[in-house]
């Protein structure tokens, strides 16, 4: 039996996609406070006056330049993204399991009974809210997301 060797089309596509994510316009770039638009800083400081800022970055998101502010407030870490004119794009923040909506907690317990949650985040983009988790279950770590009603989402 003759064995074919070589690169499969799927492997070629995967390599191409991985390569594209390393291009400069596809990556987040760390920046200094002075490079963040004043309206972005003002919007953040108005909403989160007690947060300690840990860093700033910018990147292209769906063809639009956005600025992200990484912060900590008590036990909550938060990444808040704005457009250059100060419009809120998204908020990603850690949360305690006790703060989960009951339907999300129930769905998580059904999907991973006895699993250990490594990270829980609430992600808000406009009016859309999702809950993302890293969970250890049966010796494997998985990532999963749910909407507020406990329906599983694709991530």
Model-found features: residue ranges?
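Bacterial N-terminal signal peptides that target proteins for export
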Residues: 2-12
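Bacterial N-terminal signal peptides
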Residues: 10-21
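Sec/Tat signal peptide C-region and signal peptidase I cleavage site
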Residues: 22-26
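Interaction-mediating elements
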Residues: 27-155
């Amino acid at each position: 039996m003759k064995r074919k060797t070589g690169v499969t089309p799927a492997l070629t596509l995967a390599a191409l996609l991985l390569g594209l994510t390393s291009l400069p316009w596809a990556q987040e770039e760390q920046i200094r406070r002075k490079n963040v638009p004043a309206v972005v800083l003002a919007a953040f400081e108005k909403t989160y006056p007690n947060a300690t800022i840990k860093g700033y970055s910018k990147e292209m998101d769906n063809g639009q330049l956005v600025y992200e502010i990484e912060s900590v407030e008590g036990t909550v870490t938060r990444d808040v993204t704005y457009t250059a004119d100060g419009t809120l794009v998204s908020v990603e923040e850690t949360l305690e399991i006790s703060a989960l909506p009951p339907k999300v907690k129930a769905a998580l317990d059904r999907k991973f009974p006895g699993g250990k949650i490594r990270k829980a985040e609430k992600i808000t983009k406009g009016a859309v809210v999702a809950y993302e988790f890293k969970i250890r279950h049966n010796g494997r770590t998985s990532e999963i997301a749910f909407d507020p009603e406990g329906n599983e989402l694709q991530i």
